[in-house]
């Protein structure tokens, strides 16, 4: 993940993660402070903002689709072609991995909290549609850019430190998140 330039669509975010990794190395070298560097894919799940403009991508799509359903809209617009593939991390998986990782004394390398499994934006949109009970059509607005075509994390280091780590099923995580937001939007 340190090879090459960070994709322009995540330039600030990606470079901040790299800077934190280097900062952790400095703390270890200068002050003997051990750190754990966990790298996450896109996260989603209950507890995030109810404002679709201030939340993560998948939660934002869930909120907007629930709003479209309540408004009786016949269409739901997704930006881009729907073809980019993204890996998603349910919030409970992140918390579980973080708690388990704190038991390690020192990790000199970053660990991806990834499954090496992704879903296209279109696939996730259709899962959300099913979970929400939205009866309208999903429309892809191709005047918006897609960003990087595939963002999936490797899992070899996660398997080394937490070989039995179990992830939530993506559709189950979406259903749980829809249930959380149904009464809030």
Listing of model-derived features with the role each one plays in the protein:
Residues 1, 5, 9-12, 42-43, ...:
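Residue-level preference for alpha-helix termini and adjacent loops
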Residues 1-37, 43-44, 48-53:
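Catalytic helix-loop patch of NAD(P)-dependent Rossmann-fold dehydrogenases
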Residues 3, 59-62:
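Cytosolic eukaryotic protein kinase-like domains
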Residues 19-22, 56, 60, 89:
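Active-site phosphate/pyrophosphate-handling residues
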Residues 30, 65-66:
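Short beta-strand/turn micro-motifs at beta-sheet edges
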Residues 43-45, 57-58, 94:
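Conserved sequence/active-site signature of Rossmann-fold short-chain dehydrogenase/reductase
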Residues 53-56, 156:
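Short, hinge-like loop/turn segments at secondary-structure boundaries
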Residues 61, 67-185:
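C-terminal substrate-binding subdomain of Rossmann-fold SDR/epimerase-dehydratase oxidoreductases
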